[in-house]
Amino acid sequence: MGKPAAERRLSENEAQAFARLIRSSPRKLNLVAQLIRGKAAGEALALLTFSKRRVAGEVKKVLQSAIANAENNHQLDVDRLYVSHATVGRALVMKRFHARARGRGARVEKWFSNLTVVVRERADEPVQEAAE
């Protein structure tokens, strides 16, 4: 009994990972996501490791999860992976109150974001660098 398995939304040479409710605004998170779009997986991990932005650690965890999904669930070659999509979306916005002068209050919005990273296996063979 039970319902049939859903069809795979991605192609056979892709894997993805999600992060929900990242405590950063979508605008700031998208700056980090732009760094890794189209880059090889190893190069993207190196960029995120040495990035000064706080949210780069969260993006790195999602990218590592996507790489692990590709390797373990879809049997893709890790050396041929690259970041095909890195999309950022809005999540909830917490509204808070900040006390101001003369008994007034100001609204403080604390933005949350969602992140989706899709890695794809390149069709061509990885380039072997000449060893000296």
Swiss-Prot record:
Keyword check for Zinc-finger: no
Similarity comment text for this entry: Belongs to the universal ribosomal protein uL22 family.
Subunit comment: Part of the 50S ribosomal subunit.
GO cellular component term, pick one: cytosolic large ribosomal subunit
Entry annotated with the keyword Zinc: no
Organism: Rhodospirillum centenum (strain ATCC 51521 / SW)
Name under which the protein is recorded: Large ribosomal subunit protein uL22
GO molecular function ontology, one term from the record: rRNA binding
Database matches in PANTHER family: CHLOROPLAST 50S RIBOSOMAL PROTEIN L22-RELATED, LARGE RIBOSOMAL SUBUNIT PROTEIN UL22M
UniProt keyword annotations, A-Z: Ribonucleoprotein, Ribosomal protein, RNA-binding, rRNA-binding
GO biological process, alphabetically ordered: translation
Function statement: This protein binds specifically to 23S rRNA; its binding is stimulated by other ribosomal proteins, e.g. L4, L17, and L20. It is important during the early stages of 50S assembly. It makes multiple contacts with different domains of the 23S rRNA in the assembled 50S subunit and ribosome. The globular domain of the protein is located near the polypeptide exit tunnel on the outside of the subunit, while an extended beta-hairpin is found that lines the wall of the exit tunnel in the center of the 70S ribosome.
PROSITE patterns, per database record: RIBOSOMAL_L22
Name of a matching Pfam family: Ribosomal_L22
